[in-house]
Curated annotation (Swiss-Prot):
GO biological process, one term: peptide biosynthetic process
Protein name from the UniProt record: Elongation factor P
Organism ancestry: Bacteria, Pseudomonadati, Pseudomonadota, Gammaproteobacteria, Alteromonadales
Molecular function via GO: translation elongation factor activity
Location(s) in or outside the cell: Cytoplasm
Native organism: Shewanella woodyi (strain ATCC 51908 / MS32)
Pathway it works in: Protein biosynthesis; polypeptide chain elongation
Length: 186
């Protein structure tokens, strides 16, 4: 059993007797109130999606499924194809990846975990941090150096995030895949 706060994208939870892939989580905290976790879920069996809200301390069944370390091979619309160390290929529907699809690029070297339910590849969990190239960002604003200055940037794969003001187009940056936040320039 995990608390709602411990669940992250790529996990599979049992809800109302059906397995659901967690595609996105967003935790909000307010003054004296407990944390609230919003989750975007996709039903593995019915191919339907929903958004639901839990209290941070709510307990839920995190289904322990077979997981394999795989690397990304290619995209064959609408499937992402991953390969394990023994060269077996597994198709994962694009809809099951959620926000992770914005970080998947051709030639990526990071090892992902592909999750299986009843022999079918149902989700992919990215490593906690990945390194991507900034494909576009505005030039730094001169003289704007007070505090932590952030600006929008697009990275290879298509994800958009806020980066530090000193980051330029072409720089390699480290991204936390759980939150989609800029960590550092590499």
């Amino acid at each position: 059993m995990k608390t709602a706060h411990e669940i992250r994208p790529g996990n599979v939870i049992m809800l109302d007797g059906s397995p659901w892939v967690v595609q996105k989580t967003e935790t909000t905290r307010s003054g004296r109130n407990a944390a609230i976790v919003k989750m975007k879920l996709k039903n593995v069996l019915l191919d339907s999606s929903t958004e639901t809200t839990f209290k941070g301390e709510d307990k839920m069944d995190d289904i322990i499924l077979e997981r394999l370390d795989c690397t990304y091979s290619y995209f064959a619309d609408p499937m992402y194809v991953f390969m394990d160390a023994e060269y077996n290929q597994y198709d994962v529907e694009a809809g099951n990846l959620g926000d992770a699809s914005a970080y998947i690029v051709d030639g990526m070297e990071e090892v992902c975990q592909v999750t299986f339910y009843e022999g079918k590849a149902i989700s992919v969990e990215l490593p906690t941090t990945i390194v991507r190239e900034v494909t576009y960002t505005e030039p730094s604003a001169r003289g704007d150096t007070s505090g932590k200055v952030m600006k929008p940037a697009t990275v290879s794969g298509g994800a958009t995030l806020s980066v530090a003001d000193f980051v330029k187009t072409g720089d390699m940056i480290e991204i936390d895949t759980r939150t989609g936040e800029f960590k550092k320039r590499v």
